[in-house]
Amino acid sequence: MKRTYQPSVTRRKRTHGFRVRMKTAGGAAVIRARRAKGRVRLGVQ
């Protein structure tokens, strides 16, 4: 059986990247929350 997680840098960035997050109000809220918490990584590098 094939495993469910098949890593791909492209897909990772396109779905969870910083710019994708900033496109929607909800995504921007996620970034704000992570900034407030003091996260070093706000989105996917």
UniProtKB/Swiss-Prot annotation:
State the Gene3D superfamilies in the record. Answer: 1.10.287.3980
Coiled-coil positions: none
One GO molecular function term of this record is: structural constituent of ribosome
For this UniProt record, the keywords arranged alphabetically read as follows: Ribonucleoprotein, Ribosomal protein
A GO term (biological process) for this protein? Answer: translation
Pfam family name, one: Ribosomal_L34
What GO terms fall under cellular component here?
ribonucleoprotein complex; ribosome
The similarity comment for this entry is:
Belongs to the bacterial ribosomal protein bL34 family.
Q: What is this protein called?
A: Large ribosomal subunit protein bL34
Q: Which organism is it from?
A: Nitrosospira multiformis (strain ATCC 25196 / NCIMB 11849 / C 71)
Gene name as annotated? rpmH
